[in-house]
Every structure is written in C-alpha cells, then in structure tokens.
Amino acid sequence: GVSPEKGIITAVVAGFVVSLLGGSRVQIGGPTGAFIVIVYGVVQQYGETGLLVATFMAGVLLVAMGLFKLGAVIRFIPYPVVVGFTAGIALTIFTTQIADLFGMNFGGEPVPGDFIGKWMLYFRHFGSVNWANLAVGMGSILLIVLTPRFSRRIPGSLVAIVVLTAGVWALRTYAGMEGVDTIGDRFTIRAELPAAAMPAMDWEVMRSLFPVALTIALLGAIESLLSATVADGVTGDRHDSNTELMAQGAANR
C-alpha cells in the first residue's frame, strides 16, 4: 500500500537498529510477509499517517513488553504453533505474490486485504494472465532452486536477478518485447531521503488504532522471538528475549 522507497528505507534503518541493539547475535531485522494484510488494511482505512501512528504505538508496546520481562513467555508456546506460524507466513507471502507472478490485470478492481477475497479475485481474472511475465517468474524460481546444485558459494537469488534482468533488457531492447514490466515501469523510486517528521497524534485516531497497534506488537514479538529460538537451535547460542523485544520496539519507533 506504500511506495517501494519507503519499504527500502524502513528495511535499512530498522534492520540496522535491530542488529545493533537486538538480543540475538545472528538475527537480522527486516520486512516480513506476516504484516502485509495488517499494513494494507491500515493504509486503506487510515492512510500512511495512520500506519505511522500504529507503528509508533506498536514500538512503544514492544519496549514496554521488554521492560516488563515478557520475553520469557516464548517458552510456553507449543512447538506445533511454531510450525503453523511459519507455514502461515509462507502461505501469506505466496498468496500476495500470485498476481505479480502471473502478471494479472484486474482492470482497476481493488485487491482485497483478506486471504479468501484475494483468491476469489485471482480466479475471476485468471484470463488476464501475462504468459511472458509468468515465464520470467518461473525462470527465476528454477534458477534459485537449481543454482545450489552447481555452486553453493553463489546465491541462486543473485543469479536469477542478474541473468533474467539482462535477458529481459536484451529482449526489450533488441526484440521489442514489452510484455514484462520492470520496477521502473510500475513505480517511481526517488533517490532522496524524505524529511523526518512526527505524525499528527489525534487521540480519537490513536484509540481506534490501538487494537491494530497491539496486533502489530504481538505479531512482531512472536515472529521475532520464534525466529531467534530457531536460530538458537542452529547456532547453539542463547538469545535475550527481553533485549530483542526492546530493540524491535526501538526500530518501530
């Protein structure tokens, strides 16, 4: 629901803060698909200012959770919840990317924020599939999957970006192919940083956004601490849950 440069700037700043102050030595903070539905709904109803207010409030709640030592609660979450949580995130990301993978054209019809609504929209507009777009997307997936079989030093995602970007550029330049959109075709990414400013705090808006802020805080806490727990199992380290929560809160503020 927001422009790409906002996501890039947020990822860099928040990732730096979480890595600097976080309670896990190997965890890196960044954007996640679990928040897509929530963020989209907030932007649609309250605009970007509402999203800023909700995120700021969520940051305050996360810091408070860390100060009150609520990070230890992660120990009581059943393991099947961890598995279901991870699978749910994967399914959410998959669902949100279907339209772009298939190059669908919805004719100006807004994309619903809920899971079922998205799939109903996809089925209604399946006839608008852009096959050239789908071919490039499937090529990316194949390169990412197959590259590790030949070289584990070079990331498959990097190979896919380089090879297919060059291929699409060559086809557009020398063969006149226009079926595949680039990021530049869809968005205008400005190079300058936006001026930092506090959002307008309206008490009525804050009260209506509190449930959303609480959801963001709880989801962020659970996802961050579950990821840290999984990382502990791989590295043998032990993270500090409360420090991690406060770092996540500072990054959101």
State what each model feature region is.
Residues 1-253:
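Transmembrane helical cores of multi-pass ion-transport proteins
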